[in-house]
Amino acid sequence: SEGGGMTRHSLEYSTAYAPAYRVIHENIAPFLGVFAAIDTLLANKNDNYVPVVTIDGRCGSGKSTLADLLFSVYRCGVVHTDDFFLPTSLRTKERLSTPGKNIHYERFNSEISESAATMRPGDTIKYGVFDCQCGTITSSREVATKPFLLIEGSYSSSPDITIKRDLSIFLTISNEEQLRRIAERNKDKYADFINKWIPMEEEYFQEYNIKE
């Protein structure tokens, strides 16, 4: 307009369509569908029920970033599957050659799945945190179960994990961008990702149709 002010819709247009706009952060925009699904889940749940949401996907695809974003908005309890890294005593050739077994799912079920089966809003779940550097559980973490429990990380959709899921999210990434991110943040373990962890993840995705 000549005065430099903001252009407005005409009265006729506003009356007919009632337009409304929101400005959101660019980090949130790619996940609007996720927020909509979670909001719908929360709106339709029983007052005494705690929904479980999982985020699985390729390494480097942004699982932890999305989990942090969801926590900042909902203040939900977050459990990381990295805290259930497989201890050395269980890393047998047979187990590691079986898709989806590269996680201590037995401990996950004992500490998380069983508690989640009876949890109510406001309850807390306490579990041990595995330290990969020390090769053992060195600390514990307590997470809230309100308004929902979020399970973040590779293998969170594994059928060996018996927790009841209400919403499952899968994140993907191009091979080129995946390698770039790994080289940037895990340079010292780049070879392990290429030769071990990525192939194991891909076998797991294919074996159980996780992307579906």
What are these regions (language model features)?
Residues 1-33:
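Charged, amphipathic alpha-helical linker segments immediately N-terminal to NTP-binding catalytic cores
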Residues 1, 7-9, 158, 163, ...:
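Small-molecule kinase domains that catalyze NTP-dependent phosphoryl transfer to phosphate-bearing small molecules
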Residues 58:
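P-loop (Walker A) phosphate-binding loop of NTP-binding proteins
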Residues 77-80, 86-142, 148:
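Conserved nucleotide-sensing/catalytic segment adjacent to the nucleotide-binding pocket
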Residues 52-54:
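Short hydrophobic/aromatic beta-strand immediately N-terminal to the Walker A/P-loop
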Residues 63:
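Conserved lysine of the Walker
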Residues 136-185:
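ATP-dependent NMP and nucleoside kinases share a basic, alpha-helical "lid"
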Residues 66:
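Hydrophobic positions on the alpha1 helix immediately C-terminal to the Walker A/P-loop
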